[in-house]
Amino acid sequence: MPKNKTHSGTAKRFRVTGSGKLRREQAGRRHILEKKSSRVTRRLEGTEAVAKADVKRINKLLGR
């Protein structure tokens, strides 16, 4: 059976950690930031772990 191809859009949005967990950027910090408080924009900094329900599907899209 042939290998699955990596979904390039998914590959750009998710990172695999050394232990194999998935990380993602948080939504809501790209534009229209003027009306958002500094507290909100700081809270959206950094990455977050992918929800347990989504891990299997994302791994499949990443060809893992």
Curated annotation (Swiss-Prot):
Q: Which GO terms describe its molecular function?
A: structural constituent of ribosome
Q: Which InterPro entries match?
A: Ribosomal_bL35 (IPR001706), Ribosomal_bL35-like (IPR021137), Ribosomal_bL35_sf (IPR037229)
UniProt lists compositionally biased (Basic residues) regions at 1-15
Superkingdom assignment: Bacteria
Listed under GO cellular component are: cytosolic large ribosomal subunit
Record-linked Pfam families:
Ribosomal_L35p (PF01632)
The Gene Ontology biological process annotation of the record reads: translation
Q: Tell me the keywords, alphabetical order.
A: Ribonucleoprotein, Ribosomal protein
Keyword Ribonucleoprotein assigned to the entry: answer is yes
Residue ranges, annotated region (Disordered): 1-27
Keyword Ribonucleoprotein annotated: yes
The similarity annotation says: Belongs to the bacterial ribosomal protein bL35 family.
Record's protein name: Large ribosomal subunit protein bL35
Organism, by scientific name, is Saccharopolyspora erythraea (strain ATCC 11635 / DSM 40517 / JCM 4748 / NBRC 13426 / NCIMB 8594 / NRRL 2338)
